[in-house]
Amino acid sequence: MRRLYLSAALILLLAGLSGLHVWHLNGFTSQLTGLLTQAQQQVRQENWTGAALLTREAKEHWMDHEGYLHTTLHHDDIDAILISMDEVLAFLEGGEKQPAEYAAANARLLTQLELLVEAELPTLTNLL
């Protein structure tokens, strides 16, 4: 009977830690999404420098959590988001200001961040 209680306690601990991970990841990606959305608004106001600063801040925030992210998530997903951040920064810091191309790259990055959280949710689709 003791083994049963220990097994149940371990399962509950793992479920709790998984929930904590999803909660933390959701908060983290929400912060990044907020910064990138603000950057998009800066581009609409033709403040490319402000948008670049906000996007760099989002990238630095991402890099600060890279150890945690590599421990808990798929490496391909993490690398794809980092590449997308670099692409968005290239549009912002490039000599030619291309708002449509920037908007498309930024939208793709925002979608990748959203999908990152969705992939961690304990849904039937993710379990199968």
Residue ranges and their predicted role:
Residues 1-34, 38, 56-128:
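C-terminal-biased regions
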Residues 33-50:
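Short extracytoplasmic/periplasmic juxtamembrane "stem" segments immediately C-terminal to an N-terminal membrane anchor
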